[in-house]
Amino acid sequence: MIEADRLISAGATIAEDVADRAIRPKLLAEYVGQPQVRSQMEIFIQAAKRRGDALDHLLIFGPPGLGKTTLANIVANEMGVNLRTTSGPVLEKAGDLAAMLTNLEPHDVLFIDEIHRLSPVVEEVLYPAMEDYQLDIMIGEGPAARSIKIDLPPFTLIGATTRAGSLTSPLRDRFGIVQRLEFYQVPDLQHIVGRSARHMGLEMSDDGALEVARRARGTPRIANRLLRRVRDFAEVKHDGAISAEIAAQALDMLNVDAEGFDYMDRKLLLAVIDKFFGGPVGLDNLAAAIGEERETIEDVLEPYLIQQGFLQRTPRGRMATVRAWNHFGITPPEMP
């Protein structure tokens, strides 16, 4: 099993990227959630526009699916400039980045997704571009090689990453603004689901939007994916209108429970509870018990369960919390 196979995966498919583009907010006034980020960016953008400057370089980090690309689009729209988009793995050679930089207009935004995956050679080109708006290019090879400097227009680099710790210090230090996106609160997700439903022309009650939001794991991308599947269910099994009851029926059918857990989440927790009496259990034993690789458990399954307080990592192994026992209606053992 890989993360992309799961309905509640925070990763995006190409089809979802296209579908989500139509319902993304375009301006800060439409941006829901992340109140601290929103208020700070409003000030930074207004200040840059009043001075007639490019916005400082911006690093956005946080778990996948929280709207890093959306925020980059909003920044470009608010600044009234073009947005050029690429990603770390695509920029294989220094020339790839140089070509993008030399085609920028003044104050344009260059958005690099997965910026932690830039190669060292490409990263070296970014340093003078970010600091001095200059491009240092080597022409020729061997003894005949020479360096030339190309002046660049003032621009804004927006880097997005799910792994801020993987960025090198020299790159991280060149960002004047750093924003962390947090998991969304249920009321904010409910608002997002309702807005998406209206854009899709759906008849959906507030309670229906709330039911989807509760199971979306704090992630707008998951909320919109669940909404599309609930829409399918409502159109086939009912008259297309989505109430809380219909949303719950659809999500139960899709094996997404009230906490947003899918079959694999529940399988892991039940293995710890049933097979290992709540733990502690070593990672290798747990992997064998559920038929998954240890890397899948560590990187895909565990993080959300730990973050929500259903699983603990201890020096002796993984343990189910009281909250996990209660989730399945099982009485936890008495603590010695």
From Swiss-Prot:
Gene3D superfamilies, A to Z: 1.10.8.60, P-loop containing nucleotide triphosphate hydrolases (3.40.50.300), Winged helix-like DNA-binding domain superfamily/Winged helix DNA-binding domain (1.10.10.10)
Keywords noted in UniProt: ATP-binding, Cytoplasm, DNA damage, DNA recombination, DNA repair, DNA-binding, Hydrolase, Nucleotide-binding
GO molecular function, one term: ATP hydrolysis activity
Chain sites annotated for binding Mg(2+): 69
Reactions mediated catalytically: ATP + H2O = ADP + phosphate + H(+)
EC numbers on record: 3.6.4.-
Main localization category: cytoplasm
Binding residues for ATP: 23-24, 65, 68-70, 131-133, 174, 184, 221
UniProt xrefs under CDD domains: AAA
Recorded domain comment: Has 3 domains, the large (RuvB-L) and small ATPase (RuvB-S) domains and the C-terminal head (RuvB-H) domain. The head domain binds DNA, while the ATPase domains jointly bind ATP, ADP or are empty depending on the state of the subunit in the translocation cycle. During a single DNA translocation step the structure of each domain remains the same, but their relative positions change.
Assembly mode: Homohexamer. Forms an RuvA(8)-RuvB(12)-Holliday junction (HJ) complex. HJ DNA is sandwiched between 2 RuvA tetramers; dsDNA enters through RuvA and exits via RuvB. An RuvB hexamer assembles on each DNA strand where it exits the tetramer. Each RuvB hexamer is contacted by two RuvA subunits (via domain III) on 2 adjacent RuvB subunits; this complex drives branch migration. In the full resolvosome a probable DNA-RuvA(4)-RuvB(12)-RuvC(2) complex forms which resolves the HJ.
Protein name according to UniProt: Holliday junction branch migration complex subunit RuvB
Underlying gene: ruvB
